[in-house]
């Protein structure tokens, strides 16, 4: 297998042009006027509904913004179990793609050029390849708007996850939920903003299936 590092610096490979790019979505998130306590009955019912969604898929766009670069790509997230899930990033401008595949042996990151890296230490691999520690195991829950049971998070008056923070390897990720799909139960996120210092990930989910 070929060795490669910091794949996501290949922003031109995954860049999406056009006014519909997730990069144009709003980033500023206002604090909710009313914060619902974690033991609220409706919120607890919402959490139970989210917990029942154990196998699902989501498609949309993901954007990356830093002082050095900004790009966006399509994403296809397929989640089956905590040790069986995958994320594919692709562009409608080329046939190139980037895949992250989780199995019982750890995480494999590969691209359409034949480059591949695998490691049991997933956090270290994400740091090596992407340049930032990102808890990919937690992403399955973040995407659904399902916080850690004893985590530091805020619930809005619609009984939706509004914000939370997550510490990993001395770094802090702050998540803000800007919009939800409210035409189905349970309400699932439509636009999420993840921030880690000067780096921002904007995730827009266009399709949910479970």
From Swiss-Prot:
| Highest taxon of the lineage | Bacteria
Keyword hit for Transport: yes
Q: Name one GO cellular component term.
A: cell outer membrane
Lipid-attached positions, S-diacylglycerol cysteine: 19
Give the signal peptide, or none: 1-18
GO biological process terms on file? lipoprotein localization to outer membrane; protein transport
Question: Which keywords does UniProt give here?
Answer: Cell outer membrane, Chaperone, Lipoprotein, Membrane, Palmitate, Protein transport, Signal, Transport
Main localization of the protein described in the UniProt heading: membrane
Record Gene3D superfamilies: Lipoprotein localisation LolA/LolB/LppX
Covalently lipidated residues, kind N-palmitoyl cysteine = 19
Which Pfam families does the entry mention? Answer: LolB (PF03550)
Annotated compartments: Cell outer membrane
Q: How does it assemble?
A: Monomer.
- Provide the family line: Belongs to the LolB family.
Q: What is this protein called?
A: Outer-membrane lipoprotein LolB
The major lineage groups are: Bacteria, Pseudomonadati, Pseudomonadota, Gammaproteobacteria, Pasteurellales
The coding gene here is lolB
